[in-house]
């Protein structure tokens, strides 16, 4: 099996150390140990056995997730982050010759990973002109007898647009009618500025998520699959061939903080995200010669369309070389002419980064 490189990851890993301003990473500032202990009043007892594993997931985390998703433990597979969660869903559903339908623009691993198994990608465009909304009629026309899986993110990565429950229900109904499943990666959903329930419980829907993006707990690498039991059984069996078990201490710590302080973590996120969004919105309104954009419905990423005649990779490399500013090329999300901006840093850092972005664009404009 040949594993293609994920351009987005390579771009971030190679260039982040050289950037003074970072609008590329898509997670909120992490929770500190001091914050964790203040929120949970928990620390490991001295006799805690660090040799423990939980192949079927820590009961404490499963109980917490049952409460969040109103599900049973049979509906849960705990994983090492959302990446493993998605990997297990793809590997349990797709074989060579199968087709999967994937939103575009989208998050690169969500099509490169299933292609590892010989599955054929069918692009499902989400168009800038329609504010990156999902087109249900188009989806219906894309489904064939070879279709096994429909894949989308909610909130949409890279635009931050929310797919509302009415649209998700329509997608689920199509999937049920055609006997296929829908994978909804909800890693950003708790960061929505508008109330939006999880898609779990709708027919033929599989949900994945993790504690990384919204909660500021990326170091735990705690993820999960929430799905009908026939799916979780398959994914649990496949997990024995991947990590075997996620980190038990990480799952315990995730369970305590989500159980005790999930709403506080969401408020922490929303405070930062809404403040920064207003700053970004004001900045965008003053940069119409350079950008058009669809305002995100939450999260901390957006996907503006730029007006300059330059490839997205060349533009981002220019900004890195001249301004020490790191942003992500739209081509890595399969949409040329755009960049993905993240705004989860602190407010002063965001303002400085936006100032650098404006300087870079004006300098480039003078050269063209």
Predicted segments — roles?
Residues 235-242, 258-281:
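Structural signature of PLP-dependent enzymes
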Residues 117, 177-178, 203, 323, ...:
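Helix C-cap/helix->beta junction micro-motif
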Residues 1-81, 88, 260, 368:
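N-terminal small-domain helix-loop-helix segment of the aminotransferase-like
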Residues 201-234, 247-249:
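Active-site PLP attachment segment
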Residues 128-193:
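Active-site phosphate-binding strand-loop segment of PLP-dependent enzymes
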Residues 255, 271-281, 292-306:
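Conserved glycine-rich beta-strand-loop-beta hairpin in the small C-terminal domain of fold type I
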Residues 318-327, 333-368:
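PLP-dependent enzyme catalytic core of the Aspartate aminotransferase-like
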Residues 92-152, 173:
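PLP-dependent aminotransferase-like
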């Amino acid at each position: 099996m040949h594993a293609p490189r994920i351009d987005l990851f390579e771009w971030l890993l190679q260039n982040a150390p050289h950037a003074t301003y970072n609008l590329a990473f898509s997670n909120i500032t992490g929770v500190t140990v001091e914050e964790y202990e203040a929120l949970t009043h928990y620390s490991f007892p001295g006799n805690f056995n660090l040799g423990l594993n939980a192949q079927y997931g820590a009961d404490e985390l499963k109980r917490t997730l049952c409460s969040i998703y109103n599900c049973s433990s049979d509906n849960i597979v705990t994983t090492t982050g959302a990446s493993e969660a998605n990997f297990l869903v793809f590997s349990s559903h797709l074989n060579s010759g199968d087709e999967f339908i994937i939103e575009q623009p989208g998050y690169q691993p969500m099509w490169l990973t299933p292609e590892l198994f010989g599955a054929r990608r069918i692009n499902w465009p989400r168009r800038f002109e329609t504010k990156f909304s999902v087109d249900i009629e188009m989806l219906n026309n894309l489904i064939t007898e070879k279709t096994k899986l429909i894949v989308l993110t909610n909130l949409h990565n890279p635009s931050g647009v929310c797919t509302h429950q009415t649209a998700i229900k329509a997608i689920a109904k199509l999937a049920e009618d055609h006997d296929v499943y829908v994978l909804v990666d909800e890693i950003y959903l708790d960061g929505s500025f508008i109330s939006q329930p999880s898609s779990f419980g709708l027919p033929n829907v599989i949900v994945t998520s993790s504690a990384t993006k919204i909660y500021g707990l990326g170091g735990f690498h705690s993820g999960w699959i929430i799905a009908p039991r026939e799916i979780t059984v398959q994914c649990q069996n496949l997990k024995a061939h991947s990590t075997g078990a996620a980190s038990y201490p990480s799952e315990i710590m995730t369970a305590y903080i989500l159980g005790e302080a999930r709403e506080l973590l969401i408020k922490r996120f929303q405070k930062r995200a809404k403040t920064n969004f207003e700053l970004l919105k004001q900045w965008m309104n003053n940069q119409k010669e350079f950008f058009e954009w669809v305002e995100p419905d939450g999260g901390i990423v957006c996907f503006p369309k730029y007006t300059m005649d330059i490839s997205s990779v060349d533009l981002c490399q220019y900004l890195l070389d001249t301004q020490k500013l790191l942003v992500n090329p739209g081509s890595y999300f399969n949409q040329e002419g755009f960049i993905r901006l993240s705004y989860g840093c602190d407010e002063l850092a965001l303002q400085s980064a936006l100032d650098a972005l404006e300087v870079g664009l004006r300098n480039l404009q003078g050269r063209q």
